[in-house]
Amino acid sequence: MKKAGKKNSDAGKTFILISSSCSSCQKAIEFFDQNKISYVVENFYKKPISDKRFKDILSLSEDGTESLFSKRADQIKATNSVSVEELSISELIKLVRERPSLLRRPIIIQYNSSGIPKRMRIGYNSSEIKVFERKLIEPKPIIQQ
């Protein structure tokens, strides 16, 4: 149970999930640097993606796991005769920890001031990444009278 008043550690942050040798990841970081947008880098090859972060990513995915996994994910089906779509969330998390190269990179996820995931982009696209130049619209508090 969370303590009252304790702020979510993801609140107001943008995370760029990368692998060190990924040129698309470096382009995303350059974009954020050039536009003076703050971010936190998480190298998921060195430190596995947390269960919470992975679930947040899934919650923002418009097409389930399809856009998250690279074409290499087809190898899973060939070797295990099961597709990524058939795996449970816990099985997906285990798979990503064992084989991080299956994920497309970078994964950019942005949280609002309450720590709720609001925006995500997977892969680098020079026009789509510009969405992060805009401020998140925060909900106005409801005032009861």
UniProtKB/Swiss-Prot annotation:
Pfam families: ArsC. PROSITE patterns: ARSC. GO terms for molecular function: oxidoreductase activity. It comes from the Bacteria. Gene3D superfamilies: Glutaredoxin. SUPFAM superfamilies: Thioredoxin-like. Disulfide bonds join 22-25. The keyword Transcription does not apply. Keywords: Disulfide bond, Oxidoreductase, Redox-active center. PANTHER family: ARSENATE REDUCTASE (PTHR30041), GLOBAL TRANSCRIPTIONAL REGULATOR SPX (PTHR30041:SF7). Belongs to the ArsC family. This is Uncharacterized protein MG127. It comes from Mycoplasma genitalium (strain ATCC 33530 / DSM 19775 / NCTC 10195 / G37).
